[in-house]
UniProtKB/Swiss-Prot annotation:
Family that this chain belongs to: Belongs to the AB hydrolase superfamily. Lipase family.
Protein name: Lysosomal acid lipase/cholesteryl ester hydrolase
AB hydrolase-1 domain residues: 80-380
Positions annotated with a glycan in the UniProt record: N36, N72, N101, N161, N273, N321
Species of origin: Homo sapiens (Human)
Documented effect of changing H129P: In CESD; significant loss of enzyme activity
Statement: the UniProt record of this protein carries the keyword Hydrolase: yes
Length: 399
C-alpha cells in the first residue's frame, strides 16, 4: 500500500512537471541552491570566514563567520560577538537563506556585530571526526546531550579565543535553545561566558507538542530503528537537491514544497517568501543522527527534560553512574534570557513554553507572537521588524 501511494505521488509530480495544461513552467533556479554557506554569505556582498573546531570527543565542527557588515568594514575596533545556533535537522544556512535585508545573520553584521554561526555534529557541514568516519555506527552515537556537553563549549571557547572577547550573545532556535538550556545550566563556567541568551521558539519539554513529529516519537525505539536504521536521519542528499531545483521551482509545486515545511511546524504560509523555497529546501533538512531522533522520541513519551535513556539500568549506570537518565533543571541556569514564542508553533507549543517560562530564573523579556509558527523565527517575512530589531535593541541595552 505504501509503495502504491509513493508511486501515485511520483506520477502526480511528474505529470505536473510535464503538463502543458498547467503551463509546465519552472521559475529560474536560484544560484544559492548550489552554494555552501560561505558562498551564500559572499554572494550577498558580506565578508565570509570558515573555521573547523575539534570537540573534546573528536568531532570536527564547521563555524561560519561574518566579521562585519557591508558598510562598517573600516571600523577596526572590537565588535560585540553573536553566536547563532540552528535547530533540529538544520544548519548555519538558516540564518542567511533569506534576502540580505531579512536574514538575521546579515542584519546583525550590518548593525555592527561580529556574527558566528554554528553547525551541530552530523549535519551537512559537520560530518568529520578525528578517528571515526560517517560509515561507522560509532560516529552517529550522539544526541542533543553531546551537542550541549561538547559542541557548544568547543564552539564558544574557540570564538572567544579568536576574537579576544570575554562573552558572546547566544541566539538559539528550536533545538539550538534546547542545548543552550542544558549547557548553561550544567556548565557554570560556560554560562559565565554568555552575555545574554535569546531563545527563539524554545524547546525543553515537549509534553504538549502537536507536530506530526510527535506522532513519530510515540513509536517504539526498535520500530524507529527498523524504519531509519542506526546512523543518520534525513541528511541533505542529491535527491533532495533535485527536488529543490526541479520540483520546488515549479509554479504549481512550489506551494506544495512550502506546505511540506509547515506540515511539521505549523501553518503561516502568507509569511513565507515563496521565491526562496528552492533555497530553503536545498539546504534543509541537513541531517542528524537517528539516536538524536530517538532522544526526542523519548522526550515525547516520557514528557521529561532529561538525558538520553540508553535502554537499560546497566547501560544508564555505565553512562551516568545511576540507573536512570539524569533530569535537566533549567532553573539552574542564571544567564539573562529573552524568549520569543509563536501562537501557532506546533513544536514549541504554547503550553510547553508557559511551563518553561516559570523555570527560567533570569527571564528579562518574553513576547508571544500569536500567528507565528516554528519557522517564522528564521524565515518569516515580518521577522526583521517583529523580532530582529528587538533582538538588536536588547543586545545594545545589555551591552
Amino acid at each position: 500500500m505504501k509503495m502504491r501511494f509513493l508511486g501515485l505521488v511520483v506520477c502526480l509530480v511528474l505529470w505536473t512537471l510535464h503538463s502543458e495544461g498547467s503551463g509546465g513552467k519552472l521559475t529560474a533556479v536560484d544560484p544559492e541552491t548550489n552554494m555552501n554557506v560561505s558562498e551564500i554569505i559572499s554572494y550577498w556582498g558580506f565578508p565570509s570566514e570558515e573555521y573547523l573546531v575539534e570537540t573534546e570527543d573528536g568531532y570536527i565542527l564547521c563555524l561560519n563567520r561574518i566579521p562585519h557588515g557591508r558598510k562598517n568594514h573600516s571600523d577596526k575596533g572590537p565588535k560585540p560577538v553573536v553566536f547563532l545556533q540552528h535547530g533540529l535537522l538544520a544548519d548555519s544556512s538558516n540564518w542567511v537563506t533569506n534576502l540580505a535585508n531579512s536574514s538575521l545573520g546579515f542584519i546583525l553584521a550590518d548593525a555592527g556585530f561580529d556574527v558566528w554561526m554554528g553547525n551541530s555534529r552530523g549535519n551537512t557541514w559537520s560530518r568529520k571526526h578525528k578517528t571515526l568516519s560517517v560509515s561507522q555506527d560509532e560516529f552517529w552515537a550522539f544526541s542533543y546531550d553531546e551537542m550541549a556537553k561538547y559542541d557548544l563549549p568547543a564552539s564558544i571557547n574557540f570564538i572567544l579565543n579568536k576574537t579576544g572577547q570575554e562573552q558572546v550573545y547566544y541566539v538559539g532556535h528550536s533545538q539550538g535553545t534546547t542545548i543552550g538550556f542544558i549547557a548553561f545550566s550544567q556548565i557554570p563556567e560556560l554560562a559565565k561566558r554568555i552575555k545574554m541568551f535569546f531563545a527563539l521558539g524554545p524547546v525543553a519539554s515537549v509534553a504538549f507538542c502537536t507536530s506530526p513529529m510527535a506522532k513519530l516519537g510515540r513509536l517504539p525505539d526498535h520500530l524507529i530503528k527498523d524504519l531509519f536504521g542506526d546512523k543518520e536521519f534525513l541528511p541533505q542528499s542529491a535527491f533532495l537537491k533535485w527536488l529543490g531545483t526541479h520540483v520546488c521551482t515549479h509554479v504549481i509545486l512550489k506551494e506544495l514544497c512550502g506546505n511540506l515545511c509547515f506540515l511539521l511546524c505549523g501553518f503561516n504560509e502568507r509569511n513565507l517568501n515563496m521565491s526562496r523555497v528552492d533555497v530553503y529546501t536545498t539546504h534543509s533538512p541537513a541531517g542528524t543522527s537517528v539516536q538524536n531522533m530517538l532522544h526526542w522520541s523519548q522526550a515525547v513519551k516520557f514528557q521529561k527534560f532529561q538525558a538520553f535513556d540508553w535502554g537499560s539500568s546497566a547501560k544508564n549506570y555505565f553512562h551516568y553512574n545511576q540507573s536512570y537518565p539524569p533530569t535537566y533543571n533549567v532553573k539552574d541556569m542564571l544567564v539573562p534570557t529573552a524568549v520569543w514564542s509563536g501562537g501557532h508553533d506546533w513544536l514549541a507549543d504554547v503550553y510547553d513554553v508557559n511551563i518553561l517560562l516559570t523555570q527560567i530564573t533570569n527571564l528579562v523579556f518574553h513576547e508571544s507572537i500569536p500567528e507565528w509558527e516554528h519557522l517564522d523565527f528564521i524565515w518569516g517575512l515580518d521577522a526583521p521588524w517583529r523580532l530582529y530589531n528587538k533582538i538588536i535593541n536588547l543586545m545594545r541595552k545589555y551591552q
